[in-house]
């Protein structure tokens, strides 16, 4: 297969924009409160030799294997691997409609998020099910025809990190999440890649981590020749 270098990263992060005087007051409130009341992160670091820590993997049946009936006869091109980084699914006690809808009760959401840990526990079945039955099912699965799909579970930053992205706590949360992605990718390179072309796919928070991954592993390195697109 001809290897094509096509570096085009689209980042769509679910940030909430706060405007006007009320927005500024809320922003100051968030910076004071979201950073000081969170409980410590819990849960183990992922062990990527264990299939539990992969939301999608060619070695188990998962929601990325879902294929529409009219495409079931299509053959996969096994010459390419897809490394997929899913978006934020760790919302804590918040309700998605309150977060995303203009008429949502934002202050109630903020109060619910104050005590939430900054990073997800990988044993949290609510978070895992949300990732599996949304992003992995409806996004990662579109790459079925391209080749094998690898999507690591990672200790993603809570949605509140996007409310105060400049805070030290949010930065630490994103760094921890990226460290898991990095370790997963290193495991994939060591045990699975074997010189295959690679597609890096991502969405929202996943794209933040994908950018760092591309910069660290592909920019100006021999691995860049294996990158099909990102």
Predicted regions and their residues:
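Active-site catalytic motif of lipid deacylating hydrolases and related acyltransferases
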Residues: 37, 84-196
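A general structural signal for short secondary-structure junctions and capping/turn motifs
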Residues: 72-76, 140-143, 220-222
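Bacterial Sec-dependent N-terminal signal peptides
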Residues: 1-22
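A conserved short beta-strand
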Residues: 222-229
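N-terminal low-complexity, Ser/Thr- and acidic-residue-enriched intrinsically disordered segments
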Residues: 21-124, 129
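Short glycine-enriched nucleophile-adjacent loop
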Residues: 210-218
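Gly/Ala-rich beta-loop-alpha elbow adjacent to hydrolase catalytic centers
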Residues: 202, 206
